Amino acid sequence: MKTILFTSSLRIGIAMLSLLTASLLSHAAPAVSKPNVIFILADDMGFSDAGCYGGEIATPNLDSLARGGLRFTQFYNTTRCWPTRGALLSGYYAQQIHRDTLPDVPGGMRGVRQPWARLLPDFLKPAGFRCYHSGKWHIDGKVLDGGFDRSLNMNNQGNYFSAAGNAIDDKPVKPATNESGYYATIAIADHAIDCLKDHAANHAGQPFFHYVAFIAPHFPLHALPQDIAKYRDKYLAGWEAMREVRFGRQKEMGIVNTTLSALERNVGPPYAFPDAIKQLGPGEVNRPLPWGELTEEQRRFQATKMAIHAAMVDRMDQEIGRIIAQLKAMKAYENTIIFFASDNGASAEMMIRDGGHDPQAPPGSAKSYLCLGPGFSSACNTPFRRHKTWVHEGGISTPLVVHWPAGISAKGELRHTPSHVIDFVPTVLELVGVQKPKEWKGEPIPEAPGRSLVPAFAKDVTIPHESLWWYHEGNRALRVGDWKLVAAKGDPWELYNLRTDRAEQNSLATKMPEKVTELERTWQEQTDRYIQLARGTPGGPTATDGQGRKR
């Protein structure tokens, strides 16, 4: 009997001790329980540029994130810089919030968002988040008015070697008298790391959202000499060879299930600047001509441009590595969700602006102004057709890497669900347990089209979208399930089954006119709704945001 009583008492004592220990541990645990969020956005980076998406460019840090997390194979952007950024941070198509054009609606390309069109920080800050921005902005209004606590706004996107024109916390930067050693990609990472260090020192009890928007590898092709040297002769085999090699890697990885698109020899830049072509000299070509037909001077010039593009991506990855190192140093890495994507596909644009181009300057230096052009842009967008500004797959397809050690158990897996930058806001809100309000200062908030991707973090499921919709500068598209309707400006509709033909090589439009009619009706219905919204809310067709020229 004594043994039984002793045993019972011991069990009760152990249970009480366990409860006491649990209570003590809960009080001793760090205050931060919600995950931190970092979204890293590249600019004009092709679908296949990163090593983890088939590229030969050295991207060990992105590759490491991919090995430890997820790669999405059918993630989309809006095909252009500013519409993608507005959609990414709001959860709406850019046209719904006055941030891109609509058919037959004058102006409005870069209008002012409606009062209810809040950015993600406005929903996170009431939940205790600190919010930081480092890099390109390209959204209407001032950054701090968008809910961010700190910001480096890279307004100077025409010279990677100068801080002139940039702003910190919405106040103009005074550049150093001697800017030797300055490089924009490094400066963005420096600011991001400074924000993280300050957060660890002064706000460790709060979670954070950090939007890191690199301007690389957007033109002008400016890179550090030591980075260019890694790739100087790497691309002399030409764009056809580069596409074949990248496509082979993509198939081995299981990233694509399609053919390789044919090079469109007669498709050049989306805008014509003939004087710029002349100024760039005899090495420049504005079509993806057969590599073997180019002169030696042209081959060398084109390969050099691609080497600079690669150097810019390489350097961006190095700086991402420094940001990751800071997360680890402050013991935030495990519970930080890192997203990486690009704002549009690689660019076929060719122009000279800002400080102009000195043909005698070393390529990639501050006095040069070079653009990648359609040849190697086609290779960077392997295996897809077209480029930035078009809504064929090459213009709108982006890598999406998602990494979160504390929350995603899958390692190195692929996710094939069609998804879009409009899905980022609802994804984050679900991850951090924040309910989006139904109204803002008494004004109803319209339902947003984005859907949370959280179910796909656990397994490869399809996230249901009624459709995915595009319109930019007359280029238009709609995806419903595996069907895609697409047309370049002034061209008839093309119809593709993306399950087997994401390369968009075999249009079924003439064989399936009823499917074209069905999808066109859906595209038009959505477009009409967005036109009605744009015309019926302030800040649209006649408003401007003061952000300057097209990017």
Predicted ranges, named:
Residues 24-489, 493, 500-521, 525-551:
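Formylglycine-dependent sulfatase
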Residues 9-23:
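Bacterial N-terminal signal peptides
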Residues 1-8:
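N-terminal secretory signal peptides that target proteins for export/translocation
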